[in-house]
C-alpha cells in the first residue's frame, strides 16, 4: 500500500462475479429476482454442509454431477461463443459468452435430478403415507418452480436471452437424466465397496443406498440409542 500522504495510480479492481448480480434501481421485482439468481450458490453451500456433516456417497455423487454439468456448460459456451444480450448494462460477468445459461443449466440439472430421485429412487409408493406423498409432490413442484424462476431472472436482469436459458435448461435436464442413470446403474453398485475402503472408513464416509427413508432411519436409531443410554445411566445411579 502507498505511504500516508502519497498518491499512486489507481489499481484495476474487479468484482467477485460469482455473487455479483445487478438489478434496476428501485425495481422490487428485479431485487427479488437478483436474490433468486444466487440460488446456485445457496445450493452449493447446502451440498458442502451436507457432505461435511453426513458424508454420504450419493450426496457426494450428486455434487460431482453438478460439477460435471458446470464443466459441460463451460465447454459448450466456448465452442458456440454466442455473446450475451446486446446493450446489456452489466460490466461484470463471469464470461462474455451466454449460450447456454450456466444458471439455468445448473438449476434444471439440480431440479430434474432431485425429481428423479424423489419418484424413482425413493420407491415407497406402496406403503407411503398421504403426508409423505404430499411432501414429495410439493417439494417437486417447488424445485421446478425455483428452476423456472432462476431462468426467468437471468432474462429479466438482461444477463441472457430466452434462447440461452431455454437451451441451458434442456442441457441441464439431459445431463441430469444421464447422470441419474449412470449413478443408479454404475456407481450405486460400487458404493458398498467404496464405503469399505480404509480411507472411507477413516473419513466416516457411508453408503445409505439400501435405506429407503434415511431421515426416519436416523430418527429411530437415534431415539433407540438415547433410550438405551438413559436406561444404562439410570441403572448406574441406583
UniProtKB/Swiss-Prot annotation:
Membrane topology (UniProt): Multi-pass membrane protein
A GO CC annotation given for this chain: endoplasmic reticulum membrane
InterPro entries for the chain: Dolichyldiphosphatase_PAP2 (IPR039667), P_Acid_Pase_2/haloperoxi_sf (IPR036938), P_Acid_Pase_2/haloperoxidase (IPR000326)
Region forming the signal peptide: none
Transmembrane segments: 33-53, 100-120, 130-150, 162-182
EC supergroup of this enzyme: hydrolase
Pathway given in the UniProt record: Protein modification; protein glycosylation
Keywords assigned by UniProt, alphabetized: Endoplasmic reticulum, Hydrolase, Membrane, Transmembrane, Transmembrane helix
Predominant location category: endoplasmic reticulum
Subcellular location: Endoplasmic reticulum membrane
Keyword Lyase belongs to the record: no
Enzyme Commission number, as recorded: 3.6.1.43
Family (UniProt): Belongs to the dolichyldiphosphatase family.
Stated name of the protein: Dolichyldiphosphatase 1
Organism: Papio anubis
